Amino acid sequence: MDLLLGIIQGLTEFLPVSSSGHLTLLSHLLKTDLNAYQTAVLHLGTLVSVVLFAFDGIRRSLRSWRIILNLIVSTIPAGVFGVLFEKQIDQLFSSPRFLPLFFSVTALILMFTRYSSSGEKRMENMSFLDALLVGIAQLFALFPGISRSGITVSSLLFMKYRGEDALQYSFLMSIPVVLGAGILGLEKGNVTILAPIFAFLSGLFALYVLSRSVRSGKIWQFSYYCLFVAILSYLVG
């Protein structure tokens, strides 16, 4: 079970297909009780993988006070919403009822990137407004089925940021959110140490695939898979 949870978490955390949605669906299929805090513990494994994978870029980015301030702004919406509606969000992980809707939303967002022309805006020059907007977008990824990487990268592409910068900023945004959720998960979850290890290893592979898809402008292709999972979750729900 730990092997399966870890691999699914690692692959789906960074591929724009929603790790929380997959774990909620798996929990339903296997008749297991996997809540939001337990998935957060798995996030700690993928947190290590993103830090290692993008270490040089993260180190360079954090030398800029503007980027640091923007990250704080981007983190506030999801952080505040997650604290205020903690119980309601956790309840969403106990049932696949809304998975078809949320997976479909992710599919549509990804598909729209196919028709979005590439931009030239740089992460170093991001305005506080853009930082807030992408932070609000990340807020919706608290719902299982809506991909955090998918919605943040897509939002930045819609705002005409370069693919490389959209990817890098999405990586940076994930660190405080995943770390905070993971710490809570250590207190309330029930996942052994093996699951985060498997999540770390599969997460490295997923990061490589995501990077190639964003740089080649083909992140939209994951929309087909999300639509498939939306249909599957509807059939089994």
UniProtKB/Swiss-Prot annotation:
Protein's name in the database: Undecaprenyl-diphosphatase
Family according to the record: Belongs to the UppP family.
Keywords recorded for this protein, A-Z: Antibiotic resistance, Cell inner membrane, Cell membrane, Cell shape, Cell wall biogenesis/degradation, Hydrolase, Membrane, Peptidoglycan synthesis, Transmembrane, Transmembrane helix
InterPro entries: UppP
Keyword Transport: no
Gene field: uppP
Membrane topology: Multi-pass membrane protein
Localization terms from the record: Cell inner membrane
